Curated annotation (Swiss-Prot):
One of its GO terms (cellular component) is DNA-directed RNA polymerase complex. Residues 1-233 are annotated as: Alpha N-terminal domain (alpha-NTD). The N-terminal domain is essential for RNAP assembly and basal transcription, whereas the C-terminal domain is involved in interaction with transcriptional regulators and with upstream promoter elements. It is found in: Plastid, Chloroplast. This is DNA-directed RNA polymerase subunit alpha. It comes from Lobularia maritima. DNA-dependent RNA polymerase catalyzes the transcription of DNA into RNA using the four ribonucleoside triphosphates as substrates. Disulfide bonds: none annotated. Belongs to the RNA polymerase alpha chain family. SMART domains: RPOLD. GO terms for biological process: DNA-templated transcription. InterPro entries: DNA-dir_RNA_pol_insert, DNA-dir_RNA_pol_RpoA/D/Rpb3, DNA-dir_RpoA, RBP11-like, RNAP_asu_C, RNApol_insert_sf.
Length: 327
């Protein structure tokens, strides 16, 4: 087990693993922190990350079994201790790791008497077994048992309802979820307007991925969801009842900000308070509530940052720049 003391960063936002352990071949645990965060950000990130960890990460499972020895899935076979249903349930529990895409075939071909475990599965090169000791069946007599297996990589659940009795092929309910559980908690520190948060994220996996690998994959999946928003070239605003549609180009906030900084000395910005700018009361109150007190605070925010302020609009950003350019 690896455990580190938690040191709170006061500068750059960063992830850190503070605890890592392997409880068994099929149970890994990791605890991570992200800090420093503004009030409310930890819960937003924690909820999104937990959902991505539990629902967006792909896993590999056995999804079908076929054998000439099996008449139907609730039958008992002479020379085998377990029922067919129990064997299918045991195959469902096998933990696999792979980077395959599509479907692959595997095979079990054993002669009794003896125990059949996961190590008896003949796998394609792209797939490996996490725990070779996982039990599948017990052969009590000198019989031959051959089972063809179908392996797939997917995400979430796959509940197979239909059986194909004609070719003696039986579906297996698959749980493509390497992350068994994920929790997040929040620790707040600081006072008043300076209050910040630390996000603690706990991850348990089945061994096919480490918690760190799961965290990276969940993060990539979330990033990919938001990338399309970075390529938006225009904003579309819909009026009441969608009767009219107005399309406006993105406001060139950055260009005007650069020009403004060229005209004025940035060093002086920190000594100019926003109440000196003669802003409309609503805009002034919105900025104050967001801890923007000086001109430097204001200019350190992008157009996107300002629009995120509650009750703040695109027109307010334009009005602010118009006022600043006259100063």
């Amino acid at each position: 087990m690896v455990r580190e003391k938690v040191k709170v960063s006061t500068r750059t936002l960063q992830w850190k693993c503070v605890e890592s352990r392997k409880d068994s071949k099929r149970l890994y645990y990791g605890r991570f922190i992200l800090s420093p965060l503004m009030k409310g950000q930890a819960d937003t990130i924690g909820i999104a990350m937990r959902r991505a960890l539990l629902g967006e990460i792909e896993g590999t499972c056995i999804t079908r079994a076929k054998s000439e020895n099996i008449p139907h899935d609730y039958s008992n076979i002479v020379g085998i201790q377990e029922s067919v249903h129990e064997i299918l349930m045991n195959l469902n529990e096998i933990v696999l790791r792979s980077n395959l895409y599509g479907t692959r075939n595997a095979l079990i071909c054993v002669q009794g008497p003896g125990y059949i475990t996961a190590q008896d599965i003949i796998l394609p090169p792209s797939v490996e077994i996490i725990d070779n000791t996982q039990h599948i069946a017990t052969l009590t007599e000198p019989i031959d048992l051959c089972i063809e297996l179908k392996i797939e990589r997917n995400r979430g659940y796959s509940l197979k309802m239909s059986n194909n009795f004609e070719d003696r092929s039986y579906p297996i309910d698959a749980v493509f979820m390497p992350v068994q559980n994920a929790n997040h908690s929040i620790h707040s520190y600081g006072n008043g307007n300076e209050k910040q948060e630390i996000l603690f994220l706990e991850i348990w996996t089945n061994g096919s991925l480490t918690p760190k690998e799961a965290l990276h994959e969940a993060s990539r999946n979330l990033i990919n969801l938001f990338i399309p928003f970075l390529h938006v070239e225009e904003e579309t605003f819909y009026l009441e009842n969608n009767q009219h549609q107005v399309t406006l180009p993105l406001f060139p906030f950055h260009n005007r900000l650069v020009n403004l900084r060229k005209k004025k000395k940035e060093l002086a910005f920190q000594y100019i308070f926003i109440d000196q700018l003669e802003l409309p009361p609503r805009i002034y109150n919105c900025l104050k509530k967001s801890n923007i007190h000086t001109l430097l605070d204001l200019l350190n925010n992008s157009q996107e940052d300002l629009i995120k302020i509650e009750h703040f609009h695109m027109e307010d950003v334009k009005k602010i720049l118009d006022i600043l350019e006259k100063k």
